[in-house]
C-alpha cells in the first residue's frame, strides 16, 4: 500500500468538496483536454482557462503545474484555482504530465517542455503574449516549476532529459509548498513507496538513482534564475515542511531577490487551495 499516494489523493478530494465545487467564475471560458503531445495523447493533455480580452491584444500567460507527489494528481483538482487565476486577467494553461510508476522521473519534466513548445506553436492563434509568461505549481508541481525555472536556459540539462527546446522563457512565478529537498523527504518512512515508484529506489538508497541531482532543483539554480519569484510555504506542512529553506539559502547566496510568503494560521500543505 502506498500511504503517500493515499494521502495526496485524499487531500485533493477533501479540498475539492469545499472549493472547486463551490466557487465558480462564470465569465471564464474553459477548453478541456487539449492534446499537446501527439505521441502520448492519453497523458499529455492540458486545460485552458481564458477571461474576456477586454480590449487587450494578447493574454499574459500562467502555466499551473499540479502536485501529487509525482505519482498521482490531475489538473482536474485545480480547476477552481485556475478559474480564479483567469479571473485576474491571465490565460491559464494547466497541463497533465506522466506520473510514476508508468513514467520514471524525470520523464515528467520532458512532458512539461513539450507543453511549453505547444504554447509557442499556438501563441498567435490563441493570442498569447510570449513576453509575459509565468509558471506556478504546488507540492511536486512546485518542485517541477522550480526546476523548469532553473534549467530553462540550460541546454545541456534539457538535452540530458530529452526535453524539446522552445523559445518560451518564464519571467517568474509562484512556488507553493514545493518539494525541493529529497534528503529531507527521505527521512519520512512513508516516502519509501513513493520513491520506489518514482525512481526505482527506496528512500535509503535514493542517492544511487542516476538522476538524483535532478530531484533537487536547487542544484541548478544559478544567476539566470528569474528574480520575479514568490516562494510560499506553510508553518505546519506535514509533507515538505522546511523545504523552502534550501531554496532561500541558494537565492541569498547568489544575491537573487525573491518574495517570501508564509501562510497565516495553521499553514498546512497546499494551504492556498482554501484561499481563492
Regions found by a protein language model. Give the residues of each.
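Alpha/beta-hydrolase superfamily serine-hydrolase fold, recognizing
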Residues: 1-276
Amino acid at each position: 500500500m502506498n500511504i503517500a499516494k493515499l494521502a495526496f489523493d485524499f487531500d485533493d478530494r477533501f479540498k475539492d468538496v469545499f472549493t472547486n465545487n463551490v466557487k465558480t467564475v462564470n465569465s471564464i471560458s474553459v477548453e478541456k483536454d487539449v492534446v499537446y503531445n501527439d505521441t502520448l495523447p492519453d497523458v499529455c493533455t492540458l486545460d485552458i482557462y481564458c477571461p474576456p480580452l477586454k480590449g487587450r491584444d494578447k493574454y499574459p500567460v500562467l502555466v499551473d503545474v499540479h502536485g501529487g507527489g509525482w505519482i498521482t494528481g490531475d489538473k482536474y483538482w485545480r480547476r477552481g484555482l485556475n478559474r480564479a487565476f483567469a479571473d485576474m486577467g491571465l490565460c491559464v494553461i494547466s497541463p497533465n504530465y506522466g506520473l510514476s510508476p508508468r513514467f520514471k522521473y524525470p520523464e515528467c519534466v520532458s512532458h512539461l517542455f513539450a507543453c511549453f513548445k505547444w504554447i509557442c506553436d499556438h501563441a498567435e492563434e490563441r493570442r498569447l503574449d510570449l513576453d509575459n509568461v509565468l509558471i506556478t505549481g504546488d507540492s511536486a508541481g512546485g518542485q517541477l516549476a522550480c526546476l523548469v525555472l532553473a534549467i530553462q536556459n540550460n541546454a545541456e540539462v534539457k538535452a540530458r532529459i530529452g526535453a524539446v527546446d522552445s523559445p518560451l522563457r518564464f519571467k517568474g512565478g509562484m512556488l507553493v509548498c514545493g518539494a525541493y529537498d529529497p534528503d529531507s523527504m527521505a527521512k519520512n518512512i512513508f516516502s519509501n513507496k513513493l520513491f520506489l515508484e518514482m525512481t526505482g529506489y527506496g528512500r535509503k538508497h535514493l542517492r544511487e538513482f542516476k538522476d538524483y541531482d535532478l530531484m533537487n532543483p536547487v542544484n541548478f539554480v544559478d544567476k539566470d534564475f528569474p528574480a520575479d519569484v514568490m516562494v510560499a510555504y506553510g508553518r505546519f506542512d506535514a509533507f515538505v515542511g522546511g523545504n523552502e529553506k534550501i531554496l532561500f539559502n541558494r537565492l541569498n547566496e547568489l544575491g537573487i531577490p525573491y518574495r517570501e510568503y508564509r501562510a497565516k494560521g495553521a499553514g498546512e500543505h497546499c494551504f492556498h487551495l482554501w484561499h481563492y
